[in-house]
């Protein structure tokens, strides 16, 4: 199963995919491709079976997102949001295998050349198609951005062969390249949207991705809301909306969970784990 596919199975799994860890751990400054793993601490509305069946999910996290622009993302919290709003060329499944996302297949023509075939039905949330030009634009832009330079340093050239084929030429053989194209900070952006918005790209009204959800509201340091993308080209998620509340204090997140104010909580403090699990 694709890691992104976890979010499509049930509403509980949709929310669980947004949780890196439940008890212990913390927010790290790194790019992330599919935030999964660990066990999510949840409140349920179905008699305690452990599965959330509601479609409007409320999640408590300890920190806010930093950016809505993939090329500016290096923190995990922003990566969680970006993963659900944008798509990458490839993804990694639960077994660690490289699987298709926007690209349905790829061909390794040599140690330094890869060609990806894009899905022809993939589109951004405004209905415009995702093309090889958008992929080229994304990677060319990333080479000039401080937080994505390292990921793209071994890419010599990106060529849009036609609308749905894109070729990467590397400076040297690079075994990690196939995982680089799964990174959230290399999620594909719309050339038209970024060009039109200029420096304002990343504002809520300018964000345009091709993932399962769109960002409909962001109140910094308070909450953000994701709404199901009606133009999504993949399997429809069961969750129709996800509201993420920023609650910095760990004990306050736990209290909100136990009171039923939130359905899931990011990083239950170790001292509260036993109480949450027993409740």
Please name every model-derived segment.
Residues 53-66, 104, 113-117, 135-139, ...:
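Short, well-ordered beta-strand elements
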Residues 97, 182-236, 241:
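Gly/Pro-rich hinge or "lid" segments in bacterial periplasmic/extracellular proteins
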Residues 149-152, 274-279:
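Ligand-binding "clamshell"
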Residues 60-109, 140, 208:
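N-terminal lobe/hinge region of extracytoplasmic solute-binding protein
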Residues 230-275:
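Ligand-site clamp/hinge motif
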